[in-house]
Amino acid sequence: MFYYPNVLQRHTGCFATIWLAATRGSRLVKREYLKVNVVKTCEEILNYVLVRVQPPMPGLPRPRFSLYLSAQLQIGVIRVYFQQCQYLVEDIQHILEHLHRAQLRIRIDMEEADLPSLLLPNCLAMMETLEDAPEPFFGTMSVDPTLPSPFDIPQIRHLLEAATPEKIREETLPEATPEPRKPDRTLAMVQSPEVITLQEAEPIRMLRIEGEQDLPEISRGDLDLLIAEEDDAILLEERQRGRLLRQRRASPPLDESKEEPRALEGDGLVSSLSPPAPAQVEGIREPLPDQAFPPEVQKMPGWEPGVLLTEVTPPQELRLPAPPSIEKRPPSPQRPPRRRRRGRQLLFWDKETQISREKFEEQLQTGAHCCEYPVVQPPKRKLMSPAELFRTPTLSGWLSPELLALWTHCAQVPPRMLRQRPQLETEETVEEERVADKEERRKTEALSEIEVLREAQEPSGPLMLSSELSLEVAEEEKSRTSFIPPEERWAWIEERQPEPPALPMLPELPEVPMEMPPGPELLSSEAVLRAVALELQANREPDFSSLVPPLSSRKLASRVFYLLLVLSAQKILLVDQQKPYGRLLIRLGPKFP
């Protein structure tokens, strides 16, 4: 292939777009197709083929193209031109669609030429135009349209000033109309057809591709041949059906009762699959005994062409057996009921298409092909012992190893001997507990007396001191729940049996009782009133947190809150809380002493 690289180089070569369109090397866009000048490109290809192009440099041979390259460029020009034509057709179609849509829009604005005919005339403007001429109907809303308009007065000055002709023709004045008179238009001069040289543009013709031919249209003769073949098939089918009918009539009636369901099934299938022509042929083939048709009437009613073609072979003539004559039939006193004609029977490959009733019941009785439903038994309710529940607090894997080890250590069941203590030991322990309770009560009474004396000496001191906080913390530590089960604690108490600590001798004003506050059950409303009075003397707003520190026990807080409710019910104090979980303010009531 002889060519120079600069000829087929993309974006620079003169044949680059045509070469790509011919070889389909890459996809071209619409802009590249429209940039090609088809006429100029064809001339350049012709110059290259005829070796008319000058060499790029003097002394070199003239550029030439091979036959293959020339053919490819010609194909590329055709494809580019075809694509340009297709773009043009699409643009025209797009423009026509826009014009059609614009015409379909409803015009809601009236044209200016139609406005004067639909609106009432402006009488004021007419008077100004006519130099304030009096208008008799000025101010009237409805005017008879047949009245003349001042603008329609004929102007005859130019007729009077013109030369008098020999014979004056009578001119009829035009009828007066409310619309302004339009000026006369000069008729356009119509030219002869010979002078007109404008010709219609030739339509774009598509190139005919060789080897592409349409299928020939079916002729009338081919249709007649197809109809004749179908008629032959129908006749053959009818003959087979007649043979089957004769065989069934010859067979005993028991066989008919067995084959009756099969025939009914065949009738339903034939009615949906077979064409309507066989039913008509059957009606002609088996006429009633009291009807007699001439032989020329016994034709197959159907589509009959108006004019038969000579070159078409006519179909075979239907030869049906002649109906039996009435004279040969023996007279019968009563005509038997007419049997229903059997439809076409379907032929199956298997002799037995379905299982018989006996075999079906036999298979059901054996139970080989069916099984009973298994009876679902409810799961037995498993009762777990307390020991198992203690050993497994949750499902496996849900509890961390540290908590599980702690649970298993504390969930050990003590031995039976430790759980069943003798009755004597229980009585002794009960007596010891009573004695310890009495001693504790005596201590608290002594402490309360000492506290009253100290309050009398130091009235400005707060209700709760740091020693009380430390003792409360000690009480909380004592009241913490132990992870050791009670059975083991009982065993350890019996083994150790610690001696109760000896109480020291208290002087008149000991310092130790200040570290042991009175119990919650010994608090009274008078103590709460004294604490509120102390807060007021210190110019502080009393609230619940000033009476009960945050580290106090729950029992003490509940006791103080109960006493506040009692005092507020007696209208000695007023308790106020502005928002939930907010400060509980304490104010003096009307009955405060």
UniProtKB/Swiss-Prot annotation:
Function as written in the Swiss-Prot or TrEMBL entry: Required during meiosis for separation of sister chromatids and homologous chromosomes. Proteolytic cleavage of REC8 on chromosome arms by separin during anaphase I allows for homologous chromosome separation in meiosis I and cleavage of REC8 on centromeres during anaphase II allows for sister chromatid separation in meiosis II.
Example of a GO cellular component annotation carried by this entry: condensed chromosome
Family listed: Belongs to the rad21 family.
Location in or out of the cell: Nucleus; Chromosome; Chromosome, Centromere
Origin: domain of life: Eukaryota
Listed SUPFAM superfamilies: Winged helix' DNA-binding domain
Gene transcribed to yield this protein: Rec8
Protein's name in the database: Meiotic recombination protein REC8 homolog
Modified-residue entries (Phosphothreonine), positions: 164
Molecular function in Gene Ontology: chromatin binding
Main subcellular location of this protein, as a coarse class: nucleus
Region (Disordered): 247-282, 317-344, 422-444
